[in-house]
Amino acid sequence: MSGLIKKTEGVTYLNIKEGKLVSKKNGVLETYDGVKGTISKIEFVKDEYEGKPYEKAAIHISYVDENFILQMHVDSGYFRNFCNALKSGNPKEEVYIQPSFKKDDRGKSMAGCFVSQNGKFLKHAHTKDNPGDLPQLEKVTFKGETRYDNSKQIEYWKNWISKTFAGEATQTQEQEEDGATDLPF
């Protein structure tokens, strides 16, 4: 046994795949419906997959003596739904987070996330009929196709998280340039 401890020791990393939470244990992928606990902090991490950069939210969750880090792409229905539901509850109290995924009749994928507290699913704080201060999607034309830009909504949710978890939400890089910048020599 060693006195050295890795920061991630005792932490279960959870990702989302087609509406289920997944975790790799001993090389085997295990799936779960949801995760329960209290959110202690949320970090925004820049990462890369197959040469394409993206940003993910790393949601730190504690339940009894277990620690989880739920990771989700910031530019996803999972993240937007998670934030919208969490805002209508008490973000500092215990929650149950359950991602969802389905395809519509045309085969279009729809990702979402349900959040419950005290045994009740939380409604979205912002809706189409009552958007409040949530920025509207912007219509843009790209290569002749009309699309919707959600950049302002993503920034809105990141700012809300930073304020809600003040001192606990951080922007980090997957790897620092030097990795040893805080050494005294």
Protein language model annotation of sequence segments:
Residues 173-185:
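Short acidic, low-complexity intrinsically disordered linear motifs used
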Residues 1-71, 80-86, 102-155, 159-162:
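OB-fold ssDNA-binding interfaces and closely related basic DNA-contact patches used
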Residues 76-77:
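Intrinsic disorder/low-complexity segments in short proteins, especially the signal peptide
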